[in-house]
Amino acid sequence: MPSTPYDLVQDDQDLRVPLHAEQAFFHGITFQAKFVGWEEVPRPNTRAEIVQAMRRIRYECKVQNLKKRKVTIHISVNGVRVVLKKRRRKKKNWTNDPEDIELLNHPIYRIFYVSHDSSDLKIFSYIARDASTDTFKCSVFKSHKKSQAMRIVRTVGQAFEVCHKFNLHKNSLEPNDERSDISSSELLDVEQISEQQLSEDGERGGGDNETPKKEHLAITPDLNHTQPQRPNHLDIMPSHSSLRKSNSLLCDVDDKSPGSPSSPRSEITQLKDQLEAQALQTRQALGQLMLVREQLISETNARIEAQARTQQLLQQNRELLEHLASLGAYNEQQTAGLTSANIGMAPQQSQLQMLLQATSNNNNLATINQQISNLGSINQQLTSLSHQLSGLNQQSQHLQNLQQQQQQQQQQQQQQTQAAPTAATPPPAAGGSSPYPSMSALQSISNQLQQQQQQQQQDALSKDLFQVNQELLNRLQALNLNANPGQSQPTPSATAHNSFFYVNPLSCTPATPNNNAGGAGGFNFLTSPAATGTLTPSPLGTMNRNSFAGSSSLNEDIRLSIEQNLNNLEEQLKAAVSNGNLAGLACGGSTSTRDTSRSSSTLDSPSSPRLRSSNNNISPGSSNGNQNHNNNSNSNSSSSRETRFNTVLLRVTDEAGHQRKLSATPSFITRSTSEKVPNRSQMMSQVQRTTWARHTTK
């Protein structure tokens, strides 16, 4: 539909008053216009299709640069006749000149539609059915003025009205009535028109798809029923009732004439009606068939698109699964250190396969991301378990070393016990009996008993290690892949690093009662990392029990040694507090922060682990030999302690005037730059002790 508003032409003439006299249509009315062009169009159903066809014809003529030709339009009861306009016209005749070149000629009943363009009121057109080809042709014209185009359209409408009114009048006349308002010449003209129409219908022989009753144009409704009103636009469509009446009246003009049979013509009309109904049904069936076909095509296209989308989604899921598999393989390569003899039976690969099988049935990306995070938490747990296993392996190695050392000590004791009696006692008499064979037998029996005890301890240790490994394997198998990562992690402890480590006492050399005889020569578990190797931490969140509960004798020895060392530390702390010498705390292996906080001049003097380790490496012997050896070690340690800590001392006086001696062992300040900083002892020697102590000993 056109977007511009419909502008009516200013026409002061009333529509109820005819534009032309009825007698003029029997002679013909002539108009001058320009012929734009014509084109075959399908049967129009709406006004929009007619307007589109009209504008399409104008556009094509403009594109092809076709010149508009001046024509003369003759409108009469015979029809609309379009001829070329001559340049020189001698005289005006009401009759048509046979020498004129005829372009178009359509009878009134074949005109289907007449209208003008709402956007350009100078343009008008009409659609008529061609008799030879039985197709619709749209002819477009352009007038000189807008009012002239309106007059041409109304003239065509009035011509149809005159024909319709004449047929109604002829139908109301009786056959014997000779009175008539119309002259004999006019009746002859109407009869000739009707005969010509019937002959054309007979020539078609029922080949038309449309009956003549729909081919006539109903410009105005029946005058007997309605009064003419001024329309908003001049789109005039035919009505079924008027078409039937006009067709029947035109046919009755000759039917009621004498000597003409009425039955064949009525049969022809009935056959035409049936043919029209069948043609209408076939058109409806074809329309439904085309609609179903279009729906089928759209459904097939939608199905093809859906299949393509599913294929694309399957390809994306396959790529995601391959990526997950590659991530699992990458994690396995990173955790290659777990494949040791202790955890060779850990079901890592089976769990990854189970994860891949579970994710292959799940296409949701959120669950895939959650499972990837679960993999990360599982890897963290596996690494922590691997650290625990490595610590257990180190502990087992330390136990083996301890057993070897104990065996060596026992062998040395046996050698010493065998060498001592031979050197101390003279050989016995030849004839007398000696008690030494019985003593040797007792010693062999005691050695056998000790060996049996050692074997039992080793068996208990091996069983305990096997139980620990089984427990770790069970924990590995019990890891839930689909669990929440926050639940799978170990429980945090109260420390700042969320993990508390304890030192396994069995990873160190046990302190026997012979070694613990001296106060300072005993083994100290607190500060002796270099004596027996590194201590392996074990998280309390994963192992809360003692891994070597079966070795009762070793645990008892270790407990006694720890208690004795703690007692020695307490005595040394008391002596240091009473004497004011905080440097003596270094012999115990720990630095007291409570006493050093009172003086900023106190310097750290940690004892060397090598000196302590030299005191701890004491081979056990007999009871007498052990006592002598312990006494010597005590004297050596005390003398070395006095010489080591009395070399550099600082005298500090407090506010009360008491003097105390503090160790001034230098602790060098490390710098990242090349700046040379003097030693702390050199700096403190230049400070006055009294003024310095007033500010620092509060």
Swiss-Prot record:
Biased composition (Low complexity): 396-423, 448-458, 590-640
Biased composition (Polar residues): 436-447, 662-672, 679-698
GO biological process: postsynaptic actin cytoskeleton organization
Coiled coil spans: 265-327, 379-484, 554-583
Tissue/organ expression: Expressed at higher level in wing imaginal disk.
Biased composition (Basic and acidic residues): 201-217
Positions of the PID domain: 25-194
SUPFAM superfamilies associated with the record: PH domain-like (SSF50729)
Cysteines paired by S-S bonds: none
Pfam families in the record: PID
Entry GO MF terms: nitric-oxide synthase binding
Swiss-Prot/TrEMBL keywords: Coiled coil
CC per GO annotation: glutamatergic synapse
Function: Putative adapter protein.
Protein's name in the database: Capon-like protein
Organism: Drosophila melanogaster (Fruit fly)
Lineage, highest ranks first: Eukaryota, Metazoa, Ecdysozoa, Arthropoda, Hexapoda
